[in-house]
């Protein structure tokens, strides 16, 4: 029994040690710890006959045993027990276990503490965080936006960078490290089911960073350095900037803020390159700085009930894949709309105020004169919520000048007014990625959109013109764009807002100013235009924060006459929805002029809010489907037509699903706008230039007018080879076919317009003296933009627009659709064919070959003008590619092009041998054209089809 006390003591020591370990999951059992406990339990230095032995002697004994270099003592037994007065404290001190971490105070010395959702400490370039037990293994939603870009897509200030895939993070402890984990929330199954267990095996989370614990706080929180997380290419911007890499030594913190429910971080991230790739919008491509903003907040758990989406109504989506769904289902995707958790204060009432309204705060930085149109634009949405059963669903409040809170605090939905110099607006919202519930939202306006004369429209490149007109217009071009684009950026419009409306509205303001100045209208009229435009922008961005997507078909609701009838538009706006990109509505002089922009939300907006926010009975999202289907079944009504971003690309067929168009007849609209532009040319210099001023405003106004002419003509060209697209389902009232070929008569009407306004010199016959007044700005310093040519590049810019429209007409995709259309229309019905199209274009573009039969011409008065020669070269090049089979157009189109070139050569050769005395320019041009055609025809015969 003599060993029983030792055995009991040993068990107690081991139990005590295990208890200590339970408080430190990262602790490691060391050999010296085990030895110390065993020594205490078995009494190696103290016999079991002396249970009250001095415990302070043991470390000294241990230390002395471990100190082999200590000098021998004359009284070994006594010294071993007590030691002298000086050596004993030192022995005690050296015997203490070495601290696992440096002292908290030492690690955070000279740092600045930032309280908030996560306690931060900023220490020079370092950012440290305290992560307590309540912050580990919790879900945080992370929004990434470009706070300041480089002026090139997609790195534009204001753009959300999540591309529909906002991250959910967790901090997890793993030994002596804290792992930053991105959770996989896309896949789901019924809780507790075998399928859920299979999912856990099949899909894993991603560990992004492993951060060493630097120290422990007095409260037991782990202190880690977050600098490696954010001072990195975390957003993968380098993937869209080939040749650039993140340069940590050139990157800095732009802003660090903490709030009760969120953390806001902004990094001035610099990307370095060898300088071999030139970027026009930055001064030196060896160092490109992008301000990246990170917003981190906890993902709350609420009683919110998700609502299922319908493809006839335009909401942003939260998409999950549910493996518990029946295998008989078409797919396993579950699509929820994004919306606020709006609940009636009185659920039994047909109309009720909400328990908690959606409150927007106007930031104190908004200029006083603009607060009313912005307030009115936000509150305009209450009309739609009344249809859904709510009074005063939205409130607007003004942030006081002495408000103790900042706009970045997610407890406040703010309408912000900033000066980033980028002319953008966005309505970013924080959305629960598993339910679609909107948790908070902000609207950010950049004040530079009012500085519309800063835009240098005359410097448009072919790429810039392509962006103005929808991007790639051929499938090969589109596929190349997609291949170059990182996968995380593709196909994200349905889940995250990417809005460029304000930059376009800035151009519309510039157009309005140019036209009104040329008409000598009062400044009050321009003020009216500005205030209406500002209100429409506010309505548009608020719509995004409510969950609504773009609707680019909305502008086709009215005829030109009806959209200028204010008795109608005061109730509905000038289109069916404010979620379109609407141009300024300016009509030719002598015609009725209506509102310049929509002054209220439209019928589509009311219907969409009804779908998303009407309280419906049912304990689950699926139980609501019958009532939701009744609402969505109205989609066939004219004012409820819907087409969004993926319907408005350059490759898409619907001519009415485009940006900045207006009216139900794009040919009539283009003719009206061509007249507006033509009326403005003569007086543009005098109207835009005052005595003592330079001529740069006149130059910019000219570029603005020319751009409007090109845009509306391109829009009208989409009738050729176009299709009317409908989202209606089978059985919907007034449902249309999903796809209908544009009537041949309308396609030919479009070609008539283009022959008159694009493939003709007349619209571009400006007075020579006008060109000589179009001088560029002479300032050359940071913040200014120096154009490549101080003189106006007239031939170059006119040809850019002509070639853009021509490229669309004879793109392989347009030709394929026209060719397919012959099968989609009864043979007894009229149809435009590819043979007719190419024959018309050849005759129109080379009309001089037939019309110039006699006469004498000079280089100053040529038979074929310089603008026409440029157009003819562009057409010949594209027809040559087509005839040689170098495009993906149908084989029939290639043979038609071959035959058309053969006939053109015959006509050219006949003219060259005729009586007309051609000028040197025209003769050389035709001789070269004939020779080139010969080469193409010979090559075609050698290579074959």
What label would you give each PLM region?
Residues 1-6:
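Positively charged n-region of N-terminal signal peptides that target proteins for export
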Residues 379-390, 543-544, 548, 584, ...:
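Sec-exported extracytoplasmic/periplasmic mature domains
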Residues 517, 525-529, 554-945:
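Conserved catalytic/binding loops enriched for acidic/polar residues
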Residues 32-366, 375, 384, 388, ...:
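Auxiliary tRNA-acceptor-end handling modules of aminoacyl-tRNA synthetases
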Residues 398-418, 532-588:
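The catalytic-center signature of Zn2+-dependent metalloproteases
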Residues 19-32, 39-40:
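Bacterial Sec-dependent signal peptides at the C-terminal "C-region" and cleavage site
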């Amino acid at each position: 029994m003599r060993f029983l006390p030792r055995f009991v003591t040993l068990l107690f020591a081991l139990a005590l040690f295990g208890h200590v370990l339970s408080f430190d999951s990262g602790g490691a059992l060391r050999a010296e710890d085990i030895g110390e406990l065993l020594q205490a339990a078995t009494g190696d230095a103290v016999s079991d006959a002396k249970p009250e032995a001095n415990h302070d002697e043991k470390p000294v004994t241990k230390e002395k045993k471990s100190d082999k270099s200590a000098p021998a003592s004359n009284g070994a037994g006594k010294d071993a027990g007590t030691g002298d007065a000086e050596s004993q404290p030192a022995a005690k001190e050296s015997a203490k276990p070495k601290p696992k971490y440096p002292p908290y105070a030492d690690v955070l010395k000279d740092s600045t503490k930032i309280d908030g959702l996560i306690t931060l400490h900023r220490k020079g370039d370092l950012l440290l965080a305290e992560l307590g037990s309540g912050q580990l293994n919790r879900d945080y939603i992370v929004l990434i936006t470009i706070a300041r870009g480089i002026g090139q897509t997609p790195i534009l200030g204001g753009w959300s960078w999540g591309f529909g895939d906002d991250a959910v993070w967790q901090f997890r402890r793993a030994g002596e490290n804290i792992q930053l984990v991105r959770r996989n929330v896309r896949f789901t199954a019924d809780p507790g089911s075998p399928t859920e267990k299979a999912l856990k095996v099949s899909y894993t989370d991603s560990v992004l960073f492993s951060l060493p614990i630097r120290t422990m706080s007095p409260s037991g929180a782990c202190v880690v350095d977050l600098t490696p997380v954010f001072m990195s290419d975390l957003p993968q911007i380098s993937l869209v900037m080939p040749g650039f890499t993140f340069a940590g030594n050139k990157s800095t913190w732009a802003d660090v803020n903490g709030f009760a429910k969120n953390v806001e971080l902004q990094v001035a991230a610099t990307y370095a390159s060898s300088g071999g790739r030139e970027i026009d919008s930055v001064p030196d491509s060896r160092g490109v700085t992008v301000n990246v903003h990170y917003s981190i907040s906890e993902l709350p758990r609420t009683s919110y009930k998700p609502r299922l989406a319908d493809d006839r109504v335009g909401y942003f989506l939260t998409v999950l894949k549910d493996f518990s769904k029946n295998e008989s289902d078409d797919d396993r995707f579950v699509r929820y709309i994004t919306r606020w958790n709006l609940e009636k204060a009185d659920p039994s009432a047909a109309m009720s105020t909400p328990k908690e309204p959606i409150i927007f705060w106007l930031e104190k930085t908004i200029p006083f004169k603009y607060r009313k149109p912005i307030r009115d634009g936000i509150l305009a949405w209450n009309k739609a919520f009344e249809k859904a059963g709510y009074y005063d669903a939205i409130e607007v409040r003004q942030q006081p000048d002495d408000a103790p809170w900042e706009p970045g605090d997610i407890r406040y939905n703010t309408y912000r007014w900033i000066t980033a110099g980028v002319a953008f607006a966005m309505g970013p919202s924080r959305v629960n990625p598993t339910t679609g519930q909107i948790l908070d939202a902000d609207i950010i306006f950049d004040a530079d959109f009012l500085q519309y004369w800063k835009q240098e429209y005359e410097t448009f490149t072919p790429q810039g013109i392509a962006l103005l007109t929808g991007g790639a217009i051929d499938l090969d071009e589109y596929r190349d764009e997609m291949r170059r684009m990182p996968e995380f950026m593709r196909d994200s419009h349905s889940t995250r807002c990417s809005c460029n409306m304000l930059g376009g509205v800035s151009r519309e303001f510039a157009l309005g100013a140019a036209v009104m100045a040329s008409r000598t209208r009062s400044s009050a009229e321009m003020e009216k235009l500005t205030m209406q435009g500002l209100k429409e922008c506010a309505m548009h961005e608020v719509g995004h924060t409510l969950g609504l997507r773009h609707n680019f078909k909305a502008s086709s609701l009215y005829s030109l006459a009806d959209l200028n009838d204010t008795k109608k538009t005061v109730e509905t706006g000038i289109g069916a929805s404010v979620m379109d990109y609407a141009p300024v509505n300016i009509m030719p002089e002598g015609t009725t002029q209506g509102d310049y922009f929509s002054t209220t939300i439209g019928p589509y907006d009311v219907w969409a809010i009804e779908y998303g926010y009407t309280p419906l009975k049912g304990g689950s999202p699926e139980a609501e489907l019958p009532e939701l289907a009744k609402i969505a079944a109205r989609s066939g009504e004219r004012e409820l037509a819907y087409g969004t971003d993926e319907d408005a690309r350059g490759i898409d067929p619907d001519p009415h699903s485009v940006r900045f168009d207006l009216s139900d007849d794009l040919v009539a609209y283009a003719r009206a706008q061509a007249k507006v532009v033509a009326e403005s040319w003569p007086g543009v210099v005098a109207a835009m230039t005052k005595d003592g001023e330079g001529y740069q405003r006149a130059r910019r106004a000219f570029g603005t007018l020319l751009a409007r002419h090109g845009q509306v003509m391109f829009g009208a060209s989409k009738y050729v080879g176009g299709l009317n697209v409908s989202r209606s389902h089978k059985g919907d009232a007034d449902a249309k076919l999903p796809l209908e070929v544009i009537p041949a008569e309308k396609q030919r009407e479009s070609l008539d317009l283009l022959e008159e306004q694009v493939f003709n010199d007349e619209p571009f016959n400006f007075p020579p003296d006008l060109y000589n007044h179009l001088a560029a700005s002479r300032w050359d310093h940071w913040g200014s933009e120096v154009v490549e040519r101080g003189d106006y590049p007239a031939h170059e810019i006119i040809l850019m627009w002509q070639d853009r429209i021509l490229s669309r007409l004879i793109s392989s995709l347009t030709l394929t659709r026209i060719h397919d259309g012959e099968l989609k229309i009864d043979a007894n019905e009229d149809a435009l064919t590819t043979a007719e199209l190419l024959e018309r274009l050849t005759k129109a573009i080379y009309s001089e070959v037939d019309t110039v039969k006699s006469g004498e011409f000079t280089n100053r008065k040529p038979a074929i003008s310089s603008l026409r020669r440029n157009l003819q070269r562009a057409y010949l090049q594209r027809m040559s590619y087509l005839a040689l089979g170098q495009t993906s157009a149908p084989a029939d189109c290639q043979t038609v092009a071959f035959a058309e070139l053969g006939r053109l050569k015959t006509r050219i050769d006949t003219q060259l041998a005729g009586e007309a005395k051609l000028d040197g320019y025209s003769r050389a041009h035709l001789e070269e054209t004939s020779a080139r055609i010969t080469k193409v025809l010979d090559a075609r015969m050698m290579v074959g089809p």
